[in-house]
């Protein structure tokens, strides 16, 4: 029996796409494509919705692909919600507003601004930020992340490419993830550093001394 993983819920703030906890991303992609195709007359190009994935920490590595698929179908995600569904609607425990500014060149997203608490930047390729990533902000990238500034927020790189890196002019991040590897206590660095995976663990090295395998 096929389990419905996709649901749309209308709230006072707007339409929310709810993706239930899942085991196989392809099941989500297939149902999402089918559901939106059936609702083709409902959406207009550029429509914005909110996205909530149950157990979103578990599925954070899938976020860039899901948002990319929605964008290709003409739907923009305005916010990422953290919460659970309930009989009376949705219980939201947190939210991240999507950063819309920036341009994409050759698959790389370039954003020239500071990312504030409560803002999220999600892209399926590489990300370059010219500015600071403040505590409470989050970047999720399919490829590498380079920040020309200070990082105190959450960086998730290599969600599609395990050989990706993270680089910043200085950092004291809340969390760093590269592919399936997670570092929760990265420490503080007041010089340019490069973060990458070496011998199945995340390492942080001075940019002038970094050596890749």
UniProtKB/Swiss-Prot annotation:
InterPro entries for the chain: CAP/MinC_C, MinC, MinC_C_sf, MinC_N, Septum_form_inhib_MinC_C
UniProtKB keywords: Cell cycle, Cell division, Septation
Origin: domain of life: Bacteria
One Gene Ontology term from the biological process aspect of the record: regulation of cell septum assembly
Subunit structure and binding partners: Interacts with MinD and FtsZ.
HAMAP family hit by this protein: MinC
Recorded family membership: Belongs to the MinC family.
Function of the protein: Cell division inhibitor that blocks the formation of polar Z ring septums. Rapidly oscillates between the poles of the cell to destabilize FtsZ filaments that have formed before they mature into polar Z rings. Prevents FtsZ polymerization.
Protein name, as recorded: Probable septum site-determining protein MinC
Source organism per UniProt: Pseudothermotoga lettingae (strain ATCC BAA-301 / DSM 14385 / NBRC 107922 / TMO) (Thermotoga lettingae)
